[in-house]
Amino acid sequence: MPPKSRTAGGARKTRRKEKKNVSHGHAYIKSTFNNTIVSITDPSGAVIAWASSGQVGFKGSRKSTPFAAQLAAEAAARRAQEHGMKKVDVFVKGPGSGRETAIRSLQATGLEVGSISDVTPQAHNGVRPPKRRRV
């Protein structure tokens, strides 16, 4: 009986990440009431780097804090700078508390912010919103 190969059963094959040389791109900040997700793409929309509050190490209600959004934006910006990113246009979506903090931390890590756009979707009387909380 021939020996089993490792890749067939348990271990995963990991593909080497190639360094993309992109100097200008887009930063998408999705800030919800529960989490903040930062994705940095090239101008065509291919994701170069991303980070979220949960991926940075926060759990539960701490993911929705501005500090968690700051660390997520810094992590995504550092990964994008490894690929040569220098300038980004920022698109912010959602009502969360980490919107402004994430933009500021993108600037603080050395990325030049060209423009800031709010692309939060507005309902044209679509689905019924969730009921009001009674605390």
From Swiss-Prot:
Q: GO:BP terms for this protein?
A: translation
Specify where the region named Disordered lies, as residue ranges. 1-26
Q: Which family does it belong to?
A: Belongs to the universal ribosomal protein uS11 family.
Q: Which GO terms describe its molecular function?
A: rRNA binding; structural constituent of ribosome
Please name the Pfam families in this protein's record: Ribosomal_S11
Gene Ontology CC terms:
ribonucleoprotein complex; ribosome
Q: Which UniProt keywords apply?
A: Ribonucleoprotein, Ribosomal protein, RNA-binding, rRNA-binding
Gene3D superfamilies membership: Ribosomal protein S11 (3.30.420.80)
Q: How does it associate, per the subunit comment?
A: Part of the 30S ribosomal subunit. Interacts with proteins S7 and S18. Binds to IF-3.
This protein's species is Beutenbergia cavernae (strain ATCC BAA-8 / DSM 12333 / CCUG 43141 / JCM 11478 / NBRC 16432 / NCIMB 13614 / HKI 0122)
Instruction: Give start-end positions of Basic residues composition bias.
Output: 12-23
Look up the domain of life of the source: Bacteria
Functional description taken from the UniProt entry = Located on the platform of the 30S subunit, it bridges several disparate RNA helices of the 16S rRNA. Forms part of the Shine-Dalgarno cleft in the 70S ribosome.
What is the name listed in the Swiss-Prot or TrEMBL entry for this protein?
Answer: Small ribosomal subunit protein uS11
